């Protein structure tokens, strides 16, 4: 079964081909980061227009990489939500029209489910069940995953997501867009212990997160040093911020592992690429004897490969596809609303 995946939820356009037996055959990706950097963040209208420009060339690239013809595709999976409404509509309309043209069904996919399942693209994938830490610019959640579409929410952020806190704190430190990754690199140059920042909800007793207070603490720190914003200060502040957020993510994840009794942890989403987070979790995994899995770095950001994979696994788990032509997107779409509906 050959699945074509289309991703367009924000500022990356991705097209991929996934075979149920051979695995990932190709994936083509275009990032709009350079375009949005001029504005200091994603401009939704510009994102939508650029998706329109990129989808057809990327489709040709993906087909060429895989050595496949369009009529060999068995179904077209696409991101239905959550995300930017206009950006989602571009990918949705493209996928539905393409499927209609080749008389194949479509599979609407949840963007976060794509991230959640992306470690299954690796050569050493996790097996169900496992605990998942989803950390991105828009979401921070801990879940118990027992199968495709079988998700139990253990805890989530009550305000800002971890990735959002990274980006906003980077902006406070005067770093250009996209700031989160730059803050992480800057933190490597910082000295531990120079600044102390709060660990929000670290001892709350539950698995909820809150990062708005940490962002406010960075703002206060910056204001206190407004007359001495040296490179050294920025590096030390970045180090303090990253250590605080990583400690919270790690300790909450360990608590979820203990609470569920599971021995596998999946970390997915853009923040999952953070070096300090990975190093700390790997050390804890060795110490507490559990396994931790991450997507390949190229699949931490938004991509079509994870959408193609999720679509394929959805079909294999019994979720029905639908006839092409009619469609809708869901900019706001809680992952817990997803469920497997076995075909009769």
Swiss-Prot record:
One GO cellular component term of this record is:
cytoplasm
GO MF annotations in UniProt:
iron ion binding; N(6)-L-threonylcarbamoyladenine synthase activity
EC category name: transferase
Q: Which reaction does it catalyse?
A: L-threonylcarbamoyladenylate + adenosine(37) in tRNA = N(6)-L-threonylcarbamoyladenosine(37) in tRNA + AMP + H(+)
Q: Which cofactor does it need?
A: Fe(2+)
Task: Provide the binding site for Fe cation.
Answer: 111, 115, 302
Coiled-coil spans are: none
Q: What is its EC number?
A: 2.3.1.234
Q: Which GO terms describe its biological process?
A: tRNA threonylcarbamoyladenosine modification
- Give the top-rank taxon of the lineage listed in the UniProt record for this protein: Bacteria
Signal peptide range in chain numbering:
none
InterPro entries per the UniProt record, alphabetical: ATPase_NBD (IPR043129), Gcp-like_dom (IPR000905), KAE1/TsaD (IPR017861), TsaD (IPR022450)
* Cofactor binding annotation: Binds 1 Fe(2+) ion per subunit.
Q: Which residues bind substrate?
A: 134-138, 167, 180, 274
Primary subcellular site in the record, as a coarse category:
cytoplasm
| Family named by the database record | Belongs to the KAE1 / TsaD family.
Q: Tell me the function of this protein.
A: Required for the formation of a threonylcarbamoyl group on adenosine at position 37 (t(6)A37) in tRNAs that read codons beginning with adenine. Is involved in the transfer of the threonylcarbamoyl moiety of threonylcarbamoyl-AMP (TC-AMP) to the N6 group of A37, together with TsaE and TsaB. TsaD likely plays a direct catalytic role in this reaction.
- Protein name, entry field: tRNA N6-adenosine threonylcarbamoyltransferase
Q: Which gene encodes it?
A: tsaD
């Amino acid at each position: 079964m050959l699945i074509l995946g289309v991703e367009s939820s924000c500022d990356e356009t991705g097209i991929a081909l996934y075979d149920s037996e051979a695995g990932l055959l190709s994936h083509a990706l275009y990032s709009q980061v350079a375009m949005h950097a001029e504005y200091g963040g994603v401009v939704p209208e510009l994102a939508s227009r650029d998706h329109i420009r990129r989808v057809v060339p990327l489709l040709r690239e993906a087909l060429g990489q895989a050595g496949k013809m369009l009529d060999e595709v068995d179904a077209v999976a696409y991101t239905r939500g959550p995300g930017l409404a206009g950006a989602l509509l571009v990918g949705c309309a493209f996928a539905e029209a393409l499927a209609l043209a080749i008389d194949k069904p479509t599979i609407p996919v949840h963007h976060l489910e794509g991230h959640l399942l992306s470690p299954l693209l690796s050569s050493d994938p996790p097996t169900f069940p496992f605990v998942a830490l989803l950390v991105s610019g828009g979401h921070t959640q801990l879940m118990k995953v027992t199968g495709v579409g079988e998700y139990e929410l253990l805890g989530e952020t009550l305000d800002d997501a971890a990735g959002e806190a990274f980006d906003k704190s980077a902006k406070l430190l005067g770093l250009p867009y996209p700031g989160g990754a730059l803050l992480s690199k800057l933190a490597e140059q910082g000295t531990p212990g120079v600044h102390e920042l709060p660990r929000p909800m670290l001892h709350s007793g539950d698995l909820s997160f809150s990062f708005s207070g940490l962002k406010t603490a960075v703002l206060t720190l910056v204001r206190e040093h407004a007359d001495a914003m040296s490179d050294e200060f920025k590096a030390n502040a970045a180090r303090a911020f990253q250590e605080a957020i990583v400690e919270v993510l790690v300790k909450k994840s360990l608590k979820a592992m203990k609470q569920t009794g599971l021995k596998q942890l999946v970390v997915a989403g853009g923040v999952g690429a953070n070096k300090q987070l990975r190093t700390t979790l790997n050390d804890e995994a060795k110490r507490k004897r559990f396994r931790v899995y991450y997507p390949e770095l190229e699949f931490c950001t938004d991509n079509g490969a994870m959408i193609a994979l999720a679509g394929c696994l959805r079909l294999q788990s019994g979720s029905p596809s639908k006839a092409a032509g009619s469609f809708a997107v869901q900019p706001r779409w809680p992952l817990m609303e997803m469920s497997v509906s076995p075909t009769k």
